[in-house]
């Protein structure tokens, strides 16, 4: 862009970097920037390597080193896509399109696989135990927050990023349901937002009733753009606890530690569970109850069947179904 001399073109050129950055989700850009920074730090150790524009064979060597020192292919893939993104954003040829970088990344994926830290889904029975424990008649704000987080994550298939950014003005109640506006999600590339609908249930586990209880307990009673899930003040009298006044969404580390403690409290092994276990559990329950595939995919905001299918864990009956129905 240094070659641009015309004043009008210069003004447009100044708008180009932020426009290019906004083509990706903020979290993705942040990850790519961090990944490219690590590549630069590695390059600085060697006089012969330039990080931008980079040469394919040096990228391949970097990916190989990452592969040798990692237990998962994730760092290799992040480095690969970060370097690619940085070059394309700078208007340069993408050196990761060379055969060597691609071959090293593919070998790392084959060698290291997806890792062995996949979390198990939470069952509807386990969720019922959680609701019984944390949403009883004497529950305080902190306990109701846990119940609301668990139910919304399970019934609306929410990721942490979607859950944590829900504002009070994003939640609307109708007759027999509620709908929640998600300003953005992992698959919402163009950030247009999307409504997700959750039905009322004739059950103690009704997500609509419990979310309403939580919102009343938290003091929400008029239009506000405050986040509904925030930190909670400490008080020896648990019924005097309140949401913190600072409008900051609940952090990932807080949600994770809360959920692991909740899972432990109902007798589940927290080492095989995580924040994604609720979304995964809801998806698995929907699949086992033969929810129409199109609705299933839309409700979970998945781009592809492959992405969606990763969330579903078949039981033994389902695994045997195919071989039982071959006409033999």
Q: Where are the regions that the model predicts?
A:
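Extended, non-catalytic subsegments within catalytic or DNA/protein-binding/adaptor domains
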Residues: 1-328
